[in-house]
Amino acid sequence: MTAAAHIDHDRDYPADYLATILKEVKTIAMVGASSDPTKFSYGVLRVLHETGYDMIPVNPNEAGSEIRGLRVYESLAAIGRPVDMVQVFRSSDALPGIAREAIAIGAKVLWAQLGVRNDEAARLAEAAGLKVVMNRCPKIELFRPFWKPRLNQGI
């Protein structure tokens, strides 16, 4: 994967940019994953895992336990195997540090969840060749192509 020339992270992402990411990534490390089924991160992890992505939960508060049968890691560095995408369920101010960790482990994509964006993190990741998505949910984007036909049918 090659990084986009420049993307304004305050605007909509081109549909083909998001589609390419979601088609090409196989392994996703979710920073801020929760074992609490009432948390949004749990639902997103569940759907992405059931869709076929190799999900790796990362949460220092739950390290060593399991979420949906998946081992939880303390940090990205602790994973010890290739990761295509780092998805972030943390506050915007945590993103630059997570971007540095994503770069260090050789991730190809940094994806920040809805409501999470940070220009410094975007610049760091893009300068290192990562694709960057901010303020978007991969679960929503994964199913977006199906919305329009259904809406047109009144479903």
PLM features: residue spans?
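ADP-ribose/adenylate-binding Rossmann-like module
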Residues: 102-125
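Short acidic, glycine/proline-enriched helix-loop-strand junctions
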Residues: 80-81, 119-142
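Glycine-rich, highly charged phosphate/nucleotide-binding loops
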Residues: 8-14, 65-81, 87-96
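NAD(P)-binding Rossmann-fold cofactor-contacting core
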Residues: 36-38, 45-67
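Short N-terminal or domain-adjacent regulatory/targeting segments
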Residues: 2-24
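A charged, well-structured terminal subsegment
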Residues: 141-155
